[in-house]
Amino acid sequence: MAMAEGERTECAEPPRDEPPADGALKRAEELKTQANDYFKAKDYENAIKFYSQAIELNPSNAIYYGNRSLAYLRTECYGYALGDATRAIELDKKYIKGYYRRAASNMALGKFRAALRDYETVVKVKPHDKDAKMKYQECNKIVKQKAFERAIAGDEHKRSVVDSLDIESMTIEDEYSGPKLEDGKVTISFMKELMQWYKDQKKLHRKCAYQILVQVKEVLSKLSTLVETTLKETEKITVCGDTHGQFYDLLNIFELNGLPSETNPYIFNGDFVDRGSFSVEVILTLFGFKLLYPDHFHLLRGNHETDNMNQIYGFEGEVKAKYTAQMYELFSEVFEWLPLAQCINGKVLIMHGGLFSEDGVTLDDIRKIERNRQPPDSGPMCDLLWSDPQPQNGRSISKRGVSCQFGPDVTKAFLEENNLDYIIRSHEVKAEGYEVAHGGRCVTVFSAPNYCDQMGNKASYIHLQGSDLRPQFHQFTAVPHPNVKPMAYANTLLQLGMM
């Protein structure tokens, strides 16, 4: 489902008819050793590069594919990881790590039944392996939970969580000394107090959290799927990319660029939650500002504002740990109302993922998307959340295993058809925090520095001025945060080293 930046490494080639010569075998092993060293140093792009070179010399070695599959997993190239794991198994049906890798890939893609089949294979081969048993049991639990959720979803009369809440009867205990909404309303003083409260690692009272969620659902549900914003010549707006639960880096954005206000508007381009372990703090801060400045603070949906992602990458677990399962269900409802795209002055289109698997999509098609749902596996809604640019023309299979990759010609044609200048998207880590591709027509912005405490990347945000709309990039680096590791609330399989 997600991806990494950098040069695209080609998918595995089919084995040659003739076995490689001894010299080629030796060189392939040397390349594998180099790749392993890069992998240990967390330089996954170079690891992929050298595993690929080893595969070119000896395409019949299952281990090379298994190793490259793991490197793809680490860079969130789940589609490529799945292909390599499957090839490894085809080459050697006894290669157990291949089944682990394929299960991990399918888990990341939300294909839990397929993952369960591979974990089942591992358990049969290694019946006394505690790790294998634990992963099988955890995956089986998810499969059963999903089946239960589908059964409930089949009830057309399913009620909103809001209908079962009695917020007025919730009492705020005398010993609670934290921020409270003023007459049920978010104010700037509340927001300042909230951010300091969160900075001190304290929890907002559940009544206040529910008040924010109920109110922001009402606000978001009235918005169009495509938000259209007009900037006057003297006005500017700040566009931020993924924040992924990195609350202390979010505070740093506001420190560097100023707090949101009617004269300092923001757009946050999805993926507010998951991975980082302060996702609750990030999202309630963002929702608070949305309530305070509904016309000047904009939130677009990312692929991680979805149930499948939240179940695996930590947000669901974090909400349940800090609050309740019921509150997570309400978050899920709210996420479904987040707009999918925003257009500035009719010239700059912003979305989380990218462009479309098919030609001919118009802005009016985006407006007509019924977004109040979990995203489908294909189609325009899926593409807006999931697709990625590629340097070559045309389209190709997604490295993530979802949606597609689109080339410069696709971008140019879409912009010309819709009378746009360029697109801004997020969704991918970039070493410098941003990237300008497709001849300036496709801009990526990523706002989570040192992503997951391990990527070492810079982050950035963009200023757009109404007078010319040219992107002005502002880079920043990570700031310290409390000793809570990323993925602390992620699915147990991840914590068990699924990837």
From Swiss-Prot:
Describe activation and inhibition of this protein: Autoinhibited. In the autoinhibited state, the TPR domain interacts with the catalytic region and prevents substrate access to the catalytic pocket. Allosterically activated by various polyunsaturated fatty acids, free long-chain fatty-acids and long-chain fatty acyl-CoA esters, arachidonic acid being the most effective activator. HSP90A and probably RAC1, GNA12 and GNA13 can also release the autoinhibition by the TPR repeat. Activation by RAC1, GNA12 and GNA13 is synergistic with the one produced by fatty acids binding. Inhibited by okadaic acid.
Q: How is the cofactor bound?
A: Binds 2 Mg(2+) or Mn(2+) cations per subunit.
Q: How is it modified after translation?
A: Activated by at least two different proteolytic cleavages producing a 56 kDa and a 50 kDa form.
* Location of the region described as Catalytic in the Swiss-Prot/TrEMBL record: 184-499
Residue ranges of region Disordered? 1-23
**What Enzyme Commission number(s) appear in the record?**
3.1.3.16
* Cellular component annotations (GO), alphabetically ordered: cytosol; intracellular membrane-bounded organelle; nucleoplasm; nucleus; perikaryon; plasma membrane; protein folding chaperone complex; protein-containing complex
User: Which GO molecular function, any one, fits this protein according to its record?
Assistant: protein serine/threonine phosphatase activity
Top enzyme category: hydrolase
Grouped into one coarse class, the protein's main location is: nucleus
Tissue specificity note: Ubiquitous.
Q: What does the UniProt entry say about where the protein is found? A: Nucleus; Cytoplasm; Cell membrane
Report the catalytic activity: O-phospho-L-seryl-[protein] + H2O = L-seryl-[protein] + phosphate; O-phospho-L-threonyl-[protein] + H2O = L-threonyl-[protein] + phosphate
Q: Which cofactor does it need?
A: Mg(2+); Mn(2+)
Q: What are the binding positions for Mn(2+) 1 in this chain? A: D242, H244, D271
The segment annotated Required for autoinhibition runs over 495-499
Its biological purpose is as follows: Serine/threonine-protein phosphatase that dephosphorylates a myriad of proteins involved in different signaling pathways including the kinases CSNK1E, ASK1/MAP3K5, PRKDC and RAF1, the nuclear receptors NR3C1, PPARG, ESR1 and ESR2, SMAD proteins and TAU/MAPT. Implicated in wide ranging cellular processes, including apoptosis, differentiation, DNA damage response, cell survival, regulation of ion channels or circadian rhythms, in response to steroid and thyroid hormones, calcium, fatty acids, TGF-beta as well as oxidative and genotoxic stresses.
Q: Which PANTHER family match?
A: SERINE/THREONINE-PROTEIN PHOSPHATASE 5-RELATED (PTHR45668), SERINE_THREONINE-PROTEIN PHOSPHATASE 5 (PTHR45668:SF5)
| Family note | Belongs to the PPP phosphatase family. PP-5 (PP-T) subfamily.
- Self-association and partners: Probably forms a complex composed of chaperones HSP90 and HSP70, co-chaperones STIP1/HOP, CDC37, PPP5C, PTGES3/p23, TSC1 and client protein TSC2. Probably forms a complex composed of chaperones HSP90 and HSP70, co-chaperones CDC37, PPP5C, TSC1 and client protein TSC2, CDK4, AKT, RAF1 and NR3C1; this complex does not contain co-chaperones STIP1/HOP and PTGES3/p23. Part of a complex with HSP90/HSP90AA1 and steroid receptors. Interacts (via TPR repeats) with HSP90AA1 (via TPR repeat-binding motif) or HSPA1A/HSPA1B; the interaction is direct and activates the phosphatase activity.
Name recorded for this polypeptide: Serine/threonine-protein phosphatase 5
The organism encoding this protein is: Homo sapiens (Human)
